[in-house]
C-alpha cells in the first residue's frame, strides 16, 4: 500500500511542480534564471519544514500519510535534480553569475525556509 501512496503522491507532486514552475517562469519572463525551479524548491522547503515539525511534535502523520505526503507529494514536487540540471546548463551557457546565484538562493533560502516552517508550526501549536 505504501508504494501505491508514494506513486500517487509523486504523480500529484510532479504535476503541481510542473504547473507552478512553468507559471512562475512565464511570469518572470526570464530565460536566464530558473525562477520556476527556485520557487518550487523554496515552497517545498517551507512545507516540508512545517510538516516535519507537526510530525515530530504532534504525531500528525501515520506512516502511510507520511509516505504519501513527504516521499510522494513533496518528493515529486521538490526535485533538486532539476536544480542541478538548471545550474549546469547555466554554467555551460557561460552564465556563471546566474549559476552561483541559483546555488546560493536555493541552498541558503531553502534552509532558511525549512527553519521558518518548523518555527511557524511550533508557534501555531505551542
What are these regions (language model features)?
Residues 1-126:
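Membrane-interface helix-loop junctions in multi-pass transporters/channels
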Amino acid at each position: 500500500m505504501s508504494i501505491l501512496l508514494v506513486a500517487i503522491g509523486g504523480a500529484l507532486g510532479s504535476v503541481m511542480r510542473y504547473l507552478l514552475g512553468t507559471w512562475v517562469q512565464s511570469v518572470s519572463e526570464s530565460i536566464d534564471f530558473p525562477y520556476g525551479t527556485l520557487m518550487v524548491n523554496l515552497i517545498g522547503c517551507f512545507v516540508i519544514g512545517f510538516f516535519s515539525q507537526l510530525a515530530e511534535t504532534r504525531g500528525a502523520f501515520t506512516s502511510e500519510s507520511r509516505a504519501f505526503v513527504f516521499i510522494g507529494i513533496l518528493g515529486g514536487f521538490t526535485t533538486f535534480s532539476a536544480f542541478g540540471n538548471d545550474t549546469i546548463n547555466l554554467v555551460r551557457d557561460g552564465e556563471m553569475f546566474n549559476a552561483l546565484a541559483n546555488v546560493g538562493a536555493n541552498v541558503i533560502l531553502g534552509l532558511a525556509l525549512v527553519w521558518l516552517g518548523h518555527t511557524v508550526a511550533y508557534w501555531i501549536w505551542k
